[in-house]
Amino acid sequence: MAQYYTTMNLKSRFAPSPTGYLHLGNARTALFAWLAARGAGGTFILRLEDTDQQRSPEIYERALLEDLRWFGIDWDEGPDRGGDHGPYRQMERLAVYGRYYAHLQSSGQAYACYCSADDLAAERAVQRSAGKAPRYGGRCRHLDAAARAEREAAGLLPTLRFRVPDQGTLTVPDLVWGERHYALADLGDFVIRRSDGSPAFFFANAVDDALMEVNLVLRGEDHLTNTPRQILILQALGLPVPAYGHLPLLLGADGQPLSKRYGAASLRDLRKDGYLAAALRNYLARLGHHYSATGFLDSRALAQGFALNQISRAPSHFDMVQLQHWQHEAVQSLDDAAVWNWLAPLLRGKVPMGLEMPFVAAVRANILLPGDALDWAERCFGAPALAADAVEAITGVSPEFWSVAQATLQASGGDYRRWTKALQQASGRRGKALFMPLRAALTGLTHGPELAALLPLIGEERALARLHAAARRPSTPIETTL
């Protein structure tokens, strides 16, 4: 039944509905499908399932393409670049679907259904009260031409239903879940065209995959129950059936599936926060997929290490702490110039000209997001606020210590090593007792980058002013030494 791909002809796709900004669950689906194609040297298609016109404004299509490109995903065929199997928007393919609807109707495998939403709701309620699974009972299945004409004369607009065989079992192989078996009698006849003439998801999605020669479909676990219906459609039309693999759910911190309708973080949100695409790729690629390599990987290595048999069935939980780990790894993978290019939109005018690279070299190990770098720019070149523990460290030494610190700094000409060695000898302080108050006075924090790298950025004049300000704070009564 399923026409399995080979590494010579693998063709996968991402087929989102542009009804909102790309959320992380769909971003992971796109990434897995892209990694499968790129790892095998295959083809990757982007197709837009835009039949929900009320929820698919053009702004979301533009945003989707922009976000995917930023994420590092490219495509060989798609709505913006064309291809041999277009068009790549479903609303531009209605004539294509019409031909296949006509075929199913002429062969008796589809029929017009005039049941109203109220009729169907009442039928489902009766089935539930009897302890049965809801399914269409087939009220319109055997209407003759006269009965159909009567209903249409009354202004009823029919849907089109696929006629499911009354008996038998359909076996569906899945690359993640293995074989699953469905009793056809439990499926019920399902809608393949809405009453307004627009195609239902089951139908358009399956037909497009076949006509675009997609032979590997990776999508979310929530589509598992769609698969038997789509295979029935393809078999009825004599179209090829792709290999299906359904990815485990991606859950939020609350244990609920991530969804763009219910406030899930979007790729765009994280991009605006300053997260790097490489960090998100490394993290999402590992949510539901095992890599033998545990370190940071570029896109090529992620694709080469991707294997369908390494996809887990267990749901994955999105964890910001883990994303921050990969963000740190991504930042550290960049050279200083690339880090500056990432930070520059926020830091222009905050870092003196000529000090951009020394600033990056000094603080890069201490930043996850551009906002962190902005804080360090203020601490180096502005008027930093003092943290509570910094005030405690400053007031824990005597004013005389600060006087000696100023004098030895001036004598050293701003050389950090000479200064701290002279101050150690003059004050009798060493280690944390020496460096903690200095760090607190110079940066307003008790932690951070190496002071040796920060002092040239702060500059001797600014450093002296901060040491002088520290001397003016009253020391605590327990201070007995310089």
From Swiss-Prot:
Principal subcellular localization: cytoplasm
Please state what class of enzyme this protein is: ligase
Write out the residue ranges of the motif 'HIGH' region.
Answer: 16-26
Entry's Pfam families? Anticodon_2 (PF19269), tRNA-synt_1c (PF00749)
Question: So what EC number does this one have?
Answer: 6.1.1.17
Question: Which cofactor is recorded for it?
Answer: Zn(2+)
State what protein this is by name: Glutamate--tRNA ligase 2
Q: What is the lineage of its organism?
A: Bacteria, Pseudomonadati, Pseudomonadota, Acidithiobacillia, Acidithiobacillales
